[in-house]
A protein has these predicted regions:
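Secondary-structure boundary elements
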Residues: 30-93
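Long, contiguous interaction/recruitment modules in multidomain scaffold/adaptor proteins
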Residues: 85-227, 241-253
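Canonical tetratricopeptide repeat
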Residues: 195, 229, 263, 296-297, ...
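Canonical positions in the second alpha-helix
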Residues: 215-216, 249-250, 281-284, 317-318, ...
Length: 379
């Protein structure tokens, strides 16, 4: 079973061609909202009030850089929370006090610029991380931000020299020994736009997804990930020939990109070119015999067939190889509950809660656990 995949980052691969020939504006209606990456660092009135009030006071007490770092820390003034549920600009991240790593980096950079610090961005190589949303499967990248060296600021009545300090919203243990690569700010903006395209796709907003990914490509034509996203957008829109062109562009620069290969195989199958699609499927099976969500999809199929024991075994395989992904624990809990193994199901639900990274998932799993515990107490 082939799945539609989006990738978040390919920092080491640069596209060396003009993206406009791949675009097809006339095929799509106007977007339902403004599509603009130029203002993602803009401070809202609430952010400006924070800079001039609470942050000003903290900086005068602790210094420019240390004041901001402490405000952003886990137990700091802002009390930020990691939430993988969506990508936000600086203002929305500040308002919600939460966001994914890219959203939190954008907000941090906005504050740093406002108080006179320079910023530098890094793409960090982490172990492959996957998620799914709305029938779309995502390969998740990671970025962080470094607050600059030898920058002075008189705004707060200080003349201060600071050293580079990297702000990262993953636990230190998750980053130990990982390599990073400097990326320009235009890449951060393109990542934001590409993420918004993927989120629009997952929500069924194919038209808006096109305009988001178009903006990403024009913002940073060298960034490979949006070309793959564009292929998925075209396929969802029924523009199969355009989808093939976009995906073959990805493969021109990364011939063994598993996500683009999988997406292209789906497109070729849709076009009725089964021999070509099967050749790609054989190549994919050689590159990765059991790709991400391989056992998961089989587990869902077993549940639909009311074969709970088989579903349990498939979900257990996914938990064994990727125990930090919440959905595997949740669906294993479903299969176990269907089999009457309530204690084991409760244990898996607790693990789903512990590993969830989105507020909506956390609320769902907590409600399921409460219901399961209530049913147990009733009996």
């Amino acid at each position: 079973m082939l799945l539609p995949w989006l990738l978040a980052a390919c920092a080491s691969v640069e596209v060396r061609e003009e993206p406009r020939p791949l675009l097809s504006d006339a095929t799509f209606a106007a977007p339902s909202r403004p599509i603009d990456g130029d203002r993602i660092f803009d401070l809202s009135p609430a952010m400006r009030a924070y800079v001039e009030g609470d942050l000003d006071k903290r900086i005068k007490e602790r210094g420019i850089q240390k004041g901001l770092v402490e405000a952003l820390s886990e137990r700091g003034q802002l009390r930020l929370a990691y939430d993988s549920g969506g990508t936000r600009d600086a203002a929305d991240t500040f308002e919600g006090r939460s966001g994914n790593c890219l959203s939190l980096v954008i907000m941090t950079a906005a504050f740093a610029k406002a108080i006179g610090l320079t910023v530098r961005y890094q793409s960090v190589e982490i172990d492959e991380t996957w998620s799914r949303n709305g029938g779309i499967y995502f390969n998740i990248g990671h970025v962080n931000v470094t607050l600059g060296r030898s920058m002075t600021s008189l705004r707060f009545g200080q003349l201060e020299t600071v050293r580079d300090t990297t702000i990262d919203f993953l636990p230190p243990g998750d980053l130990r020994g990982q390599r990073s690569q400097d990326i320009p700010e235009r890449r951060i903006v393109a990542m934001y736009l590409n993420n918004r395209a993927g989120e629009a796709l997952a929500a069924g907003e194919v038209n808006d997804a096109y305009w988001w990914v178009r903006a990403a490509m024009l913002q940073d034509p060298g960034f490979l990930a949006p070309y793959n996203t564009l292929g998925v957008v075209y396929r969802r829109h029924g523009d199969l020939a355009l989808a093939e062109r976009a995906l073959r562009t990805v493969l021109k620069y990364q011939p063994e990109n598993r996500l683009a290969l999988s997406n292209l195989a789906i497109v070729l199958s849709d076009l009725g070119r089964r021999d070509e699609a099967q050749a790609l499927e054989v190549k994919l099976a050689r590159l990765d015999p059991t790709p991400p969500f391989y056992w998961f999809e089989r587990g869902l199929a077993a549940l639909r067939a009311h074969d709970n024991a088989r579903a349990r075994d498939f979900f257990q395989k996914e938990v064994d190889r990727a125990g930090d992904y919440h959905e595997f624990h949740f669906w294993l809990a479903v299969a176990l509950a269907n089999l009457g193994q309530i204690e084991d199901a409760r244990r898996q639900l607790k693990l789903a809660i512990e590993t969830s990274t989105a507020r909506s998932d956390l609320d769902l799993y907590s409600a399921k656990l409460s219901k399961l515990q209530g049913a147990t107490q009733t009996h």
